[in-house]
Amino acid sequence: MEKLYCGMPLLLLVLLLASIDGSTQLQSSQSQTLLRLQQLLYYPKVLNSWNNYTDFCNSEPSPSLTVVCYEDSVTQLHIIGDNGTHMLPKSFSINSFVTTLVKLPDVKVLTFVSLGLWGWLPQKINRLSSLEILNVSSNFLFGPIPHELSSLATLQTLILDENMFSGELPDWIDSLPSLAVLSLRKNVLNGSLPSSLSSLSGLRVLALANNRFNGALPDLSHLTNLQVLDLEGNSFGPLFPRLSNKLVTLILSKNKFRSAVSAEEVSSLYQLQHLDLSYNTFVGPFPTSLMSLPAITYLNISHNKLTGRLSANLSCNSQLMFVDMSSNLLTGSLPTCLKPSSGTSRDVVYASNCLATTNEDQRPVSFCSNEALAVGILPQRRNKVSKVGIALGVTASILGVLLLAGALFVVLRRLNAKKTVTKSSPRLIRENASMGYTSKLLSDARYISQTMKLGGLGLPAYRTFSLEELEYATNNFESSAFMGEGSQGQIYRGRLKDGSFVAIRCLKMKKSCSTQNLMHHIELIAKLRHRHLVSVLGHCFECYLDDSTVSRMFFVFEYVPNGELRTWISDGHMGRLLTWEQRISVAIGVAKGIQFLHTGIVPGVYDNNLKMTDILLDNNLAAKLSSYNLPLLVEGLGKVGQVGSRSGPKGTPSIKDEDKIDIYDFGVILLELIVGRPLRAKSQVDVLKEQLQASISADDGARRSMVDPTVHRACSDQSLKTMMEICVRCLLKDPLERPSIEDVLWNLQFASQVQEGWLQNSNPSSNLGSPSPAASSLPPPSRLHVTTLESPRDSGCEEHER
C-alpha cells in the first residue's frame, strides 16, 4: 500500500501532461485576422487551403506559404504568389491591408511577394513595432519610402525589390541601427546616396541595382560587416569607391565610373569572390592582382578602357572559374593560367583587346596605344621611364602628328584647287559599313535595363551602313521608294539585301560638323530601342572631300507595316476598326513607350510632341512611337541640354513638370481612342474633355454616348469609366496635377483587367471590328516622324496649349 501511495504523484503528473494539448492554439482573433487578410488579397490560390477550421499554427509549411506561431500569437507570415501576378483590383486598399496586419502585435517577419499589392506604403506601417524582417518584393507599390519606417528600431531586413518606389534614399536610414539587409533593386529611386548610409555598421547586404541613383558614393569603408554590394545599372561615379575589406560580392557594372581601379582598394579584398566592373569607363592599368585574390571565382572587367601589358607568367587563383576582360586596351600575351591548356576548366573571354594571340578578334597594338592616348593614359612599358622622358615622348608625338596633318592639309587643298567643279563632291564616306561602332555605341548600356537590350526586341544590333547599301535598298532613291518629306528631310522605303524592310530618312546638314562631333549624339540615338518605339537600326555619314565635314546623314529605322493608329480608329483600315480591348492595349503600349523615353535612358527624352499620327502599329497591332525628341536632327545640334526643358501652358522651363507635357499629349491620343474621331484643334479637345468630365459622374448611358459607336456596346462600364477618368486627368491645365506615367499605366492595366473579366462573364452582342492583319510581301508605306528640338510642328493637329 505504501508503494502504491508513493507512486501516485508520478501517475498524476503523467495524467496531467497527457491532458495538455501538444499543439499551439492560435488566438481566435488572430485566426480571424488571417482570414481577413485572405479576403483583402482577393483569395489568391496560395491561400486556398485557409478556412474557418484551419489550424494555422500547425499547418504544414511550404515554399509559398508559412505561418509560424509562438505560444498563441503569429510571429512569422510568409505568402508568396505566382510570378507575373497582376495588380489587385482598384478596390484593394493598402491602408486596410496594413491596418489588419497591425492586429498581429507579435509578428516579427512578414513576406508578401508577388501578390499584386499596390499603392503608397502607409504611415501606419510603424505600428508593427516588433517587425524584424519586411519583404514586399515583386509588387506594384509606389511613392517614396515612408519616413515612418525609421521608428522600427528592431528592423533587420528591408526588401522592396521590383516595385515602383521613387524619390531618394532617405537620410534617416541610419535610424535603423539593426539593419543588416537593405535591398531596393528594380525601382525608380534617384538622387545620390546619403552620407548617413556609412553609419550602418551592421549592414551586410546593400543591393540598389537597376534604379536611377547617381553621383559619388559615400565612404563605405566603415561598413565593416558589408559582404554584398550590388549597384548595377545606375549612374554612380566617377571615382572608384572606398570599400570594406570584407566584401564577398562587388557589382559596379553599368554605371558612370571613369577613374582608375584602385589597386590598393581591391588588393585588400581578401574575401572577394565575385567582382563585376563591366560596362563603365574605367581607365588606367588593369590591376592584375585581381586574378590572384585568395577567394576570387568570378571576374568581369569587360567594356572599359583599362590598359596594361599582360604577361604569360601572371598567376590566377585556382578557384577562378570565369574571366571576361573583353573590349579593353590590354596588350601583351594572354596569361598561361587563362589558356584552355592550363588544365583548369575556366570560361575566359578576351576579345577586342590588342593581345598577341591567334584569336582573330584582337586589334592591332597601335589601336590600343592611340586609344590610351585619347583618354590620357599611356600604356605600361616593361622598363621604367622617367616622367620627363614620357613628357618629351608625348610632346614629340603630338608635334609629329600636327606636322603630318598640316602637310596633308596643304596637299589636299592644292589638289582641290585643280578641280573644275565649284563645289566639292560629297561622296567621301568616312565610315565603313561594319559592326565597328557597335561595341562603342552599345557597350554603354548602363542606362538601359536588361529587359530592354537588343536580343529581347528581335532587332539587329545598331550599326553603320554604307551609302551603297542604302542605294541598293532604295534602287538609287528612285521615286517609287519615296514616302514623303517633312521639316527634317526626305523619307524612303527600302529593302535591304537580307530582305528586311526599312525606312530611311535623309538629312541635309545645315551646319559644319565632323563625324567625331556627331558621335556623342549617335550614342544617344543608338540607345533609343524599345518594343514601343520605332527604333533606329543604324546611320550613314556622307562627307565633303575638301574638309571631311558631314554633308548628309541617313538614319535607318525599322519599318512598321500597319500604318498610323488613326487609320485603325476613325478611317477604318481596310474596313476594320480596333476593338475596345485592342484600344486599351494600344494605349498601354504608347504609355510604355513614353515611360521608356522618360526613365529608360539618362538623360530622359521629354517634350516629344506626340500626336495620333505619330503612333504606328506593327504586325501584332503593337503601338510604336515614331516621333520622339532626338537631339541630332538639323537644328537640334548644340542644344541637347534643352531637351524637355519647356513646360506647361506658359512654356516656362521647369524640371519638376518636364514629363507632364507628354502626359497631356497622351491624353489627347487617349481621347481620340475613346471617341473614335479625329481631333485636329484644341477647341475640340477642350469641349470633349468637359463632356467626358460630366459623363463620368452621370449614368452608364451618358458615358456610352461619348464612346465610338462601333465599340460602345463592347466595353464594360468600369473599364470605360477608368479610361475616361485617366484621360481627363491627363488633360488637366496645371501640369503638376497631371498623373505620372506610372499612374497612367496602372489605370490602363486595371481597365484592361476589368474588361477581360467582363468579357469572360458576358457575351456582348456588339463586338465589331476584330482585325486580323496580314502583312503582304511588300507592305504599304507607313509614316515616320522624328521631331527635332527647334522644328516646326507637323500639320494634322494644331499645337495644343500644354
Swiss-Prot record:
Which parts of the chain span the membrane according to its record?
A: 392-412
Which GO molecular function annotation, any one, does this entry have?
A: protein kinase activity
> What are the ranges of the LRR repeats?
71-94, 104-128, 129-152, 153-176, 177-200, 201-225, 227-244, 245-268, 269-293, 294-317, 319-341
Q: Which UniProt keywords apply?
A: Cell membrane, Glycoprotein, Leucine-rich repeat, Membrane, Receptor, Repeat, Signal, Transmembrane, Transmembrane helix
Transmembrane helix keyword on record: yes
Region ranges (Disordered): 761-802
Please state the span of the N-terminal signal peptide per the UniProt entry: 1-26
Per the record, its GO cellular-component terms are: plasma membrane
Q: Which segments does the topology annotation call Cytoplasmic?
A: 413-802
Q: Its principal location?
A: membrane
Question: Which stretches are Extracellular in the membrane topology?
Answer: 27-391
List the subcellular locations: Cell membrane
Coiled-coil positions: none
Instruction: List all Basic and acidic residues biased stretches.
Output: 791-802
| Record's compositionally biased regions (Low complexity) | 762-777
Domain comment as written in the entry = The protein kinase domain is predicted to be catalytically inactive.
For this chain, the family text in UniProt reads:
Belongs to the protein kinase superfamily. Ser/Thr protein kinase family.
* Protein's UniProt name: Probable inactive leucine-rich repeat receptor-like protein kinase At3g03770
Question: Which organism encodes this protein?
Answer: Arabidopsis thaliana (Mouse-ear cress)
